[in-house]
Amino acid sequence: MTRRFILNEVSYFGPGARKELPGEVRRLGLHKALVCTDKDLIKFGVAQKVLDVLDEAGIPYEVFSEIKQNPTVKNVKLGLEAFAKSGADFLLAIGGGSSIDTSKAIGIITNNPEFADVVSLEGVADTKHKSVPIIALPTTAGTAAEVTINYVITDEENEKKMVCVDPNDIPAIAIVDAELMYTLPRSLTAATGLDALTHAIEGLITKGAWEMSDMFEIKAIEMIARHLETAVNEPSNPEARDGMAVAQYVAGMAFSNVGLGAVHGMAHPLGAIFDIPHGVANALLLPIVMEFNAPAALDKYVTIAKAMNAYREGMTREEAATAAVDAVRQLSIRVGIPQHLAELGIKEEDLPRLAKAAFADVCTPGNPRDITEEDILELYKKAY
């Protein structure tokens, strides 16, 4: 079997790595940026840390900040207009998955205008040309959008999240600078960190996993287990922030190339229909879906238990699986993640609708254990 592994052309890591930006702009022969970010990152001065680097280097730019927490088709169309008017020749994405995913859609459609309706990008679109060059600087340690070939856009008209998979969308350059994450609020640090853990665990047990992807996912789980609580409780701790920044990227390197599973399949409609933050949805659902999947992946669950420091000598595979699930659940509780859908304003009568959407989601077929719409409904009920 032939396997494919796609990564960025160049990536930089470490506090202050944003200072590498001008050199990469020059190396790529680029001239002007459209900065894609959100209003909060501008308000709290995070985006300014990157804009200062551009200013010092004399690199011109314009700013597009009309990006929602769960970016929509409308956001993308506004971004396309902004890019066309700006005269920019590259996209500079500053933010979490929302900013980077929006940049991917803008970049792909600009060079593949036949997809200008945006909705036709859903699934594996047959694009012919690479995106406009994207340089991505994540400000959260969670989505790993800077290294993946996936992006998610909400089709607000049909209340669904479109998962788009396209090797042509991957950012040319990723700059993972933990200093951009120091002011991330506790709740967002927790949610994005558990999003990264979900990527690592689902990427480890998905049907498409293999030895190379496993290697990255196991390391990501170990690093998240070691650093997440400290990053939540000590936001300016450089070791914890940098550890999480690298861990989420490592998780993304692998899952982007092998797929995910039912946790993401179930999280997507929560975001599309009810605007629940993606990391919160994943974090709440992860231990519940892990329990369901355990019989299909017991050996991998032993590995997860070891990576989470929950394995004890002499445990059976079933005991180790239980320990792995409990370790994930307890971590989620300790960092303050809601444990019930009712806490998020979801009503019990909404669950069948969610189950139908989750069963049809592009991530669900990668689940290691075969799953039906009825199974998904029962899992939502457990989460309720």
Task: Indicate where each model-derived feature is located.
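Gly/Pro-rich interdomain helix-loop hinge
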Residues: 273-350
